[in-house]
């Protein structure tokens, strides 16, 4: 995490086990990752300081565009003007920081709650909600509007397999619970739509949004989104689809061979027996999916397995 300078509040991808790259993003400094340790540790002071530092991460978007290498709409950042960021990895990281500050009743909790409320309202007002993919954020008024690619809010469609695997489901579900009856109108429905349609059929996606989402991945990870939708809508059909995504799509399979491979020579400093087929991404997303699926739709598991 960068603690000073123009990139303060952003994280750098990799940079621990091997060389870093030019990805400087909020998804890497995501406060949600630190939240659980903070509480389990009884309020670790250093983590508390870091959570406070990350409250101003929204200001960095006027200096550095995290999507600069793949952006096609011509937008470039400028300090003190509206800034573009994604509704997945970027907004979820900013929202997590604001949510934690509100939750902790920190010195800026009212500001944080207002930023959260305003941006939630902005997402709800987008024609396609989270499916829009990104938006323009005003760091002065703390409001969120349509993205540069769709200034008239006609209904942009931009879905990434990464949007919901960096804390977004956890942050959104907590925010909805915290706001309760005060949640801005339309936001829960916008989230339910994303949860349902991410792995709906191409025909369903096209009927709802005019186009399909194309080829996606991380369906096991996203099974927890379908599980959330099934729970909220009390829909057993969606629940069974969620379990199918969990057991029979990608990620860790129940019948996978749990073998190790001996690695030595110039590949490692010390010889080691390694599960080379096991990826940390799969393990992390599998764990989250297990926890959330069982919390939301455990009553339908026997029906799926039978």
Kindly give the residue locations of the regions a language model identified.
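Catalytic cores of extracellular degradative/oxidative enzymes
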Residues: 1-305
């Amino acid at each position: 995490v960068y603690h000073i300078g123009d990139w303060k509040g952003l994280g750098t991808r990799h940079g621990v086990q091997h060389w870093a790259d030019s990805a400087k993003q909020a998804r890497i400094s995501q406060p949600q990752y630190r939240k659980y340790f903070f509480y389990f540790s009884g309020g670790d002071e250093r983590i508390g300081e870091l959570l406070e530092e990350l409250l101003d991460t929204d200001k960095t978007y006027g200096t550095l565009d995290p999507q600069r290498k793949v952006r096609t709409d011509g937008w470039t950042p400028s300090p003190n003007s509206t800034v573009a960021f994604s509704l997945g990895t970027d907004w979820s990281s900013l929202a997590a920081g604001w949510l934690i500050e509100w939750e902790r009743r920190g010195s800026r909790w009212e500001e944080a709650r207002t930023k959260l409320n305003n941006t939630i309202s902005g997402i709800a007002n987008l024609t396609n909600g989270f499916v829009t993919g990104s938006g323009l954020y005003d760091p002065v008024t703390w409001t969120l509007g349509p993205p540069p690619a769709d200034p008239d809010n006609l209904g942009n469609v931009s879905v990434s397999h990464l949007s919901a695997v960096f804390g977004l489901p956890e942050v959104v579900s907590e925010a909805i619970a915290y706001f309760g009856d005060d949640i801005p109108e339309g936001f829960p429905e916008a989230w339910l739509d994303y949860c349902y349609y991410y792995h709906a059929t191409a025909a369903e996606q096209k009927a709802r949004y005019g186009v399909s989402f194309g080829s996606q991945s991380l369906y096991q990870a996203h099974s927890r989104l379908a599980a959330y939708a099934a729970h909220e809508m009390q829909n057993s059909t969606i629940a069974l689809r969620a379990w199918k995504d969990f057991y029979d799509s990608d990620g860790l399979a129940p019948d996978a061979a749990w073998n190790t491979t001996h690695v030595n020579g110039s590949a490692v400093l010390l010889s080691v027996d390694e599960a080379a087929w096991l990826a940390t991404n799969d393990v992390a997303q599998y764990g989250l999916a297990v926890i959330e699926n069982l919390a939301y739709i455990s009553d339908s598991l026997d029906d799926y397995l039978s």
